[in-house]
Amino acid sequence: MSITAERKAEVIKTNAKKAGDTGSPEVQVAILSERIANLTSHFKTHVKDNHSRRGLLKLVSTRRSLLDYVKKKDEARYKALLEKHNIRR
């Protein structure tokens, strides 16, 4: 359900603004989106796993908060993030 270290490094590399950037909202949203996608596929086979579903809702909420922050700071970055990660709003 969690992403591997290699996959996480790849996500960071593709979304980082500069080398060593792991804390920018873009990188955090990308990592959360990857984890959400993994959990979503998990629920296709494990429908009754409600403990993990609660974790999924927490991840979605955290991602939503980060997206709200980006929207408040820069609308263009926000729209680019939504488009890049196929997030519905």
From Swiss-Prot:
PANTHER family documented for this protein: RIBOSOMAL PROTEIN S15, BACTERIAL AND ORGANELLAR (PTHR23321), SMALL RIBOSOMAL SUBUNIT PROTEIN US15M (PTHR23321:SF26)
UniProt KW Ribosomal protein keyword: yes
Entry similarity comment: Belongs to the universal ribosomal protein uS15 family.
Cellular component aspect of the GO annotation: cytosolic small ribosomal subunit
Role: One of the primary rRNA binding proteins, it binds directly to 16S rRNA where it helps nucleate assembly of the platform of the 30S subunit by binding and bridging several RNA helices of the 16S rRNA.
Annotated organism of origin: Rhodopseudomonas palustris (strain BisB18)
Pfam families in the cross-refs: Ribosomal_S15
Molecular function (Gene Ontology), one example: rRNA binding
Residue ranges of the region described as Disordered: 1-24
Oligomeric form and interacting partners: Part of the 30S ribosomal subunit. Forms a bridge to the 50S subunit in the 70S ribosome, contacting the 23S rRNA.
Keyword terms, alphabetized: Ribonucleoprotein, Ribosomal protein, RNA-binding, rRNA-binding
TM spans (from-to): none
Protein name as it appears in the record: Small ribosomal subunit protein uS15
